[in-house]
Amino acid sequence: MATISLTAAQSLGPLKVIIYDCDGVLIDSRRSNAAFYNHILERFALPPLSPRQLDFVHTSTAQEAIDHLFQGTPWRAEAQEYQRVMDNRPFLSLLRLEPHIRETLGALRPAYHTAIATNRGKSLPLVLKELGLQALFDLTVSSYEVEHPKPHPECLLKILQHFQVAPAEAIYIGDAPVDLMVSRRAGVTFGAYKNPELDAGFHLQDHLDLLKILPGGAAR
């Protein structure tokens, strides 16, 4: 169920843009990410990801993840080059859509603009195509399209500028502390997905819950 205070709900509107993180919000990608980075680690004869390492790479850019995994080794630069050129497609079959996200996006549009702000890089278009989500977003901003990835607010600010809206006219839905941080830095209300520990403006356990708390129905 959705959990949101009446005061917080009233302060949301009127909204024009709904922005989503990708991994952990639109898609369950932990198995895919684990397989991707374990493949790279195996290539350099390193042990597979620990649970803590998986948590780190799950919210990082690929470059940040490789820097972290290969720190203290002589293969960091070589591993960076390998991840830049390797084919992501073998790992796409491990992705799963989060429940009801397609229905929610369909209900939001066209009343609201929809966008993605993510630290996922070159693989984002492949992911959206694989899962049939391309037509459900007006704008996507990956780590390849900003100079400073999250937690810098550039990705959200770029979306606000594109739609010519104020921070109060958008919300950002994420699942990790870095998403909360970037929302605060951009002045955008943050909604936490399946993470009740985050100090968010509202919490969602199911994407359909968003439709129950948006002010003014589908008016934009």
Task: Give residue spans per PLM region.
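Proline-centered loop/turn at the N-terminus of a beta-strand
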Residues: 113-115, 189
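Alpha-helix N-cap/helix-start motif
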Residues: 29-30, 94, 117, 126, ...
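Secondary-structure transition/capping residues
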Residues: 48, 64-65, 77, 93, ...
